[in-house]
């Protein structure tokens, strides 16, 4: 069997607009380092920004679009079978490519498997213990021919926000956030409000009953945000231990389940099993 190329797409802040590195870095390095010599891993650089967060200042949406183009180029350059792995925003990049394959806009006959760590568009029910779904809502369709493995922690709101989480409203409002392109951000925000296209549109109304529901939603959102924040917080000399914190960045450092393996180790094992028992079958636009 020919060597499998693993293309890794990192999360927000793990790459930058002029990133031409080929060696895998960031959290996903713990996946690729655990693979055997049947695999050759390559980093796919892109802006990896969320507005003012990380270099470049592009909006999440614009950053993802650049990532999609670069990932497709990398898939076309791969000499044989390909597997894709993504973390956080990198999952969104991969999901967009999968959507193009599902729609018939892109052929990818060499794509054999996909692994997604903390997918912001994670569907409900794909990970045991996760009762919610990705904070960014439903992603693009996934072709039936491509096996996908999701890696998620139940307390990571990026991939497992509650169904009516207030954090979804923040995600909706900031998808196009960019101080470099304020006009685009404002225009997209106006369209969102004008058409009431929020994920929570059907769950928000003005009534005393809604107010009681909103109290629960506020408590839930607070817990979700604590899970996202670091495990240790400091402000003006005051240090606080946040026992719930760090869930989004712990996939390489903490056991994910009863096996004692980290999420990255679990994904590496799955990729190796796919390569052993399901040998990959070229990418054409």
At which residue positions do the language-model features occur?
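Surface cap/lid and interfacial helix-loop subdomains adjacent to catalytic sites
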Residues: 8-54, 58, 62-79, 99-285
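Extreme N-terminal starter segment of soluble prokaryotic enzymes
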Residues: 1-6
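Gly/Ala-rich beta-loop-alpha elbow adjacent to hydrolase catalytic centers
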Residues: 84-95
